[in-house]
């Protein structure tokens, strides 16, 4: 299995956190519990602090440059692409018998 680069991991976490913030704040749904969100957000925060140059090269740098692990409320919750992903994930999770 190939190991992710730091930039790839930052990009992945940014996108996951944005999608799950859209689910929580806009759709009133969540497939992550608070512990999972906190774990992912703290991991991203640590990567950002330890790797500022890689962070500046990330896909969502402008949206995450003021990010704090405590909340995703100030992220771009109205982004149409990530909203579509969030809606799809909620529906998929429901179809698989999960609760949201």
Residue ranges and their predicted role:
Residues 1-100:
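Phosphate/adenylate-binding "loop-and-lid" substructures adjacent to NTP/NAD/dNTP-binding pockets
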């Amino acid at each position: 299995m190939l190991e992710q680069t730091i930039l790839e991991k930052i990009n992945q976490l940014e996108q996951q956190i944005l999608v799950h913030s859209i689910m929580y704040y806009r759709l009133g749904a969540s497939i992550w519990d608070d512990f999972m969100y906190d774990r992912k957000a703290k991991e991203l925060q640590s990567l950002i602090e330890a790797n500022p140059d890689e962070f500046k090269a990330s896909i969502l740098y402008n949206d995450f440059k003021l990010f704090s692990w405590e909340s995703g409320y100030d992220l771009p919750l109205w982004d149409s692409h990530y909203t579509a992903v969030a809606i799809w994930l909620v529906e998929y999770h429901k179809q698989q018998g999960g609760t949201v």
